[in-house]
Amino acid sequence: MSASAPAAEGEGTPTQPASEKEPEMPGPREESEEEEDEDDEEEEEEEKEKSLIVEGKREKKKVERLTMQVSSLQREPFTIAQGKGQKLCEIERIHFFLSKKKTDELRNLHKLLYNRPGTVSSLKKNVGQFSGFPFEKGSVQYKKKEEMLKKFRNAMLKSICEVLDLERSGVNSELVKRILNFLMHPKPSGKPLPKSKKTCSKGSKKERNSSGMARKAKRTKCPEILSDESSSDEDEKKNKEESSDDEDKESEEEPPKKTAKREKPKQKATSKSKKSVKSANVKKADSSTTKKNQNSSKKESESEDSSDDEPLIKKLKKPPTDEELKETIKKLLASANLEEVTMKQICKKVYENYPTYDLTERKDFIKTTVKELIS
């Protein structure tokens, strides 16, 4: 019974292979999850496609600029400190050299004195008003000025020395010390004012012109004498040729001996007459040359006598000196109204006082003296 029971059980429940089992069907939840995943993938693909398509213009990046907020520096008002020495405009030689220099050449000197380049209108005036540095030797400011001067070239230092009436010889360090020592306590050198070269050159030109004229006159006189001598030589040659031609003719036309004896005295007479004519021509030429030489010498002596006869006052006439000009300017300024009179009018009046001389070259001196007298 026990054996039959399992058999019966086997018959009742038929066995199936594992492969033949039916696949399990997915539930509703799993299907919904799959659909959501597919939708997400589609959205990602669409976004990628959109990113590839460029729509419109590209936005430019804005340039970020740095804005420096600089605080406006207020310049200190320009003041000229009173120094221990004399003002540069009061020293005659320095005032003279300042008037000769251009404003561009004085910029470095102005910067050295006042730590600023200065304007064109007030540059020379400010340099002239300088009377010395207010600080003492060996201070911090003194060292700064020394460093500033060391940066200048030798040519610039020498031009500053020229303006300040100092020696221009020496090395860079010597020039720097010389300039600083003077600027600490400016004082006059005691040398006289340099003479203007224009007046000297004018006189030398006149002398050269007069000597040149005399040389030209001598050269023109010499050819005249030579021409006279050459003309006399030509006359002599012509006479010689004529005599030689006559002699040839005589030799060709020789008659018989009898006639020759009779004609000989006639030929001698003709030759003698020709010789006398030659001598007369030579004497005339010599006399003409001597007469011309005498006339030229007479003219020269007359011109010398006429120059000697001139009064000595004419020979000794010279242009007015600086002192004379200064006195005339003083008189003109004393009689003139300074509020109405211009510099041009004063210059014209000075020229009128000396009409025989050309004083246009001394115009600068007249102007400087007027300014000195007014100040």
From Swiss-Prot:
Primary location class: nucleus
Residue segments, region Disordered: 1-61, 184-325
Location of the SAP domain: 149-183
Keyword 4Fe-4S included in the entry's annotation: no
Phosphothreonine: modified positions: T13, T15, T199, T289, T290
Disorder named in the UniProt entry: A chromosomal aberration involving DEK is found in a subset of acute myeloid leukemia (AML); also known as acute non-lymphocytic leukemia. Translocation t(6;9)(p23;q34) with NUP214/CAN. It results in the formation of a DEK-NUP214 fusion gene.
Name of the protein this chain belongs to: Protein DEK
